[in-house]
């Protein structure tokens, strides 16, 4: 390819498709080690300047072979349950492990406390049920709060402050719980909120005002305040200065240690999904290229969110001479990646490169329809690639029955 694309999702490639990518099997994920390191350095610099602590939210990126690139700059990992907590403890040893779950299982708590340093509960009932044992085990105990402050538009599925949300405790819920159990506040070491999704720091400032209004009287008695995730800190144009002011405000006003747990920011624009064209069909006015990669299986957020992932050297439909619809090979009628403006309709066998594919892909993919899991490769700063892991029939089969 002689095309160039210097948009952020493809900047790690230098704006071109390196020849060595043509040699990789498709579909495959390619993680860019240099981009991961740069993201981690930005987050580490924030921590150094402000004294906050930054955690990797493993729900977005959990390719632990790359953890050594991140660990020098981060305080640890954030987990959503037992398995992620164990992964963080094993693969980022010596670092903090924080865990939050909407509801914990009683039969997992004994093992969970072996790995976790901070355990955050979602409700007063779970705090009362498991908090005493967590405290007795020497863990720092927190409660996720719901400041009832929505700052998102159009993505209710990702809004923890949406009406009727199951995530976090409102002030009214907390007051009722304390009235019934006055000893409940004695279990708390910190508060946690997570209300953002791919947002700038102005949304955090708005949320922090709501936290101060609803829960400000509790915070001086806390050791820490966790700002959660959804902060697009490593995105070009992100207002880091405002974020630093928010952190300093919390530290000075309430005397707390501030934690942040970004997921996307750790691996933003640090990965690619490589795919090849299997067939090109024409249905009326619609040109459709069927790929060996599936939206449903290999980039499920495309359907779930939904969104259209960036494609190298492509534009909006109608902005280039041709418009093509890219779709997966599964039997799902809706296995469609999106419509793109391109210079020419791709040919069978052509390599296509999707950007920003390190996040919410390898940790969410699946084998629906018997689709193979893509291999995972890593690309060093020198441009050399190495295989991390590949998958085969056994990985599909043994999720479904006995070995």
Report each predicted region and the residues it spans.
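A short small-residue
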Residues: 18-24, 190-194, 228-229
């Amino acid at each position: 390819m002689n095309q160039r694309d210097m948009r952020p999702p493809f900047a790690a490639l230098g704006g071109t498709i390196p020849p060595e990518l043509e040699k990789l099997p498709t579909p495959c994920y390619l993680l860019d080690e240099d981009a991961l390191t740069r993201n981690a350095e930005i987050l580490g610099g924030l921590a150094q300047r402000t004294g906050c602590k930054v955690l990797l939210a493993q729900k977005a990126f959990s390719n632990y072979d790359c953890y050594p690139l991140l660990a020098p700059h981060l305080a640890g990992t954030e987990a959503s349950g037992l398995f992620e907590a164990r992964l963080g403890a094993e693969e980022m040893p010596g670092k903090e492990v924080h865990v939050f779950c909407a509801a914990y299982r009683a039969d997992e708590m004994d093992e969970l406390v072996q790995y976790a340093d901070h355990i955050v509960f979602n409700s007063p009932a779970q705090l009362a049920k498991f908090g005493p044992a967590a405290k007795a085990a020497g863990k720092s105990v927190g409660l996720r709060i719901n400041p009832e402050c929505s700052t998102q538009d159009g993505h209710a599925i990702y809004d923890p402050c949406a009406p009727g949300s199951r995530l976090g405790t409102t002030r009214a819920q907390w007051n009722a719980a304390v009235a019934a159990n006055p000893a409940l506040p004695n279990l708390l070491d910190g508060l946690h909120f997570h209300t953002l999704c791919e947002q700038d720091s102005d949304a955090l400032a708005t949320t922090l005002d709501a936290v101060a209004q609803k829960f400000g009287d509790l915070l001086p008695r806390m050791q820490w305040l966790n700002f959660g995730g959804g902060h697009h800190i490593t995105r070009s144009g992100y207002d880091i200065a405002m974020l630093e002011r928010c952190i300093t405000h919390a530290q000075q006003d309430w005397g707390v240690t501030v934690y942040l747990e970004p997921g996307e920011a750790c691996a933003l624009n640090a990965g690619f999904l490589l795919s090849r064209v299997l067939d090109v069909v024409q249905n009326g006015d619609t040109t459709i290229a069927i790929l060996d990669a599936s939206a449903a299986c290999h980039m499920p957020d495309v359907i779930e969110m939904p969104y259209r992932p960036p494609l190298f050297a492509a534009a909006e439909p109608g902005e280039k001479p041709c418009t093509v619809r890219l779709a997966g090979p599964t039997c799902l009628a809706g296995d469609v990646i999106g419509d793109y403006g391109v210079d020419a309709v791709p040919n069978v066998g052509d390599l296509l490169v999707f950007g920003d594919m390190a996040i919410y892909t390898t940790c969410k993919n699946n084998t629906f329809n018997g689709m193979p899991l893509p291999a995972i490769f890593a690309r060093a700063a020198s441009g050399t690639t190495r295989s991390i892991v590949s998958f085969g029939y056994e990985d599909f089969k043994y999720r479904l029955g006995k070995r």
